[in-house]
Regions:
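Acidic/histidine-rich catalytic cores of soluble enzymes
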Residues: 1-119, 127
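Flexible, acidic glycine-rich loops studded with aromatic residues
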Residues: 57, 104-180
Length: 180
């Protein structure tokens, strides 16, 4: 934690600086959302190591997967438009030869798209974790599988949560399957 964060904690709690730092480490941590990490092209192992090396606790991991489009085409844009709902923002990270371009929502990514760049898109749209692909799109499930392998051999946390809040805004064709 930064010196400023430690000082503020000490000021607001009346604790010494060393007590405030210990309290921050004991009570604050990061909820690692695997969909967000994968959309950002982060490797789960590297993200976990970076947090642990910084002394930041990971009290909860959200088990989730997003959409992955390895080389976006005009046809892909037509197929993904039904996922562009008005309820949630679906951040997009596009990987091009220049690096990573970030868009707050699908509409911004549609407007910026250039087929000649052959970008890979990762879209923060939670999809069923048991699917390797959805409607011809790949998913970020491989990142989830990497994390679960690590979790089996060296547990990161005891609190795993499957995050599925976008189930109701999935295109209707993908909401009908029972998972039980």
């Amino acid at each position: 934690f930064s010196g400023e964060a430690i000082s503020l904690m000490a000021k607001y709690t009346g604790a010494s600086l060393s007590e405030a730092e210990a309290d921050l480490h004991q009570h604050l941590g990061v909820c690692l959302d695997l969909c967000h990490a994968a959309v950002e092209f982060e490797d789960p192992d590297q993200a976990i190591c970076a947090l642990q090396n910084a002394g930041i606790a990971i009290p909860k991991v959200q088990i989730s997967a997003g959409l992955r489009m390895p080389k976006v085409t005009q046809a892909d844009l037509s197929r993904i438009r039904p996922f562009d709902d008005a309820v949630y923002l679906h951040q997009v990270v596009a990987k091009t030869v220049r690096g990573l371009d970030r868009y707050l929502d699908l509409g911004e990514a549609f407007a910026a798209y250039k087929e000649s760049e052959e970008p890979e898109w990762r879209v923060h749209f939670h999809v069923p974790i048991f699917l390797a692909d959805l409607d011809g799109f790949a998913t970020t499930r491989p990142a989830l599988e990497t994390f679960l392998a690590r979790q089996r051999s060296a547990p990161v946390t005891q609190h795993l949560e499957v995050e599925t809040y976008t189930w109701d805004v999935l295109p209707a064709a993908h909401r009908g399957d029972d998972v039980v």
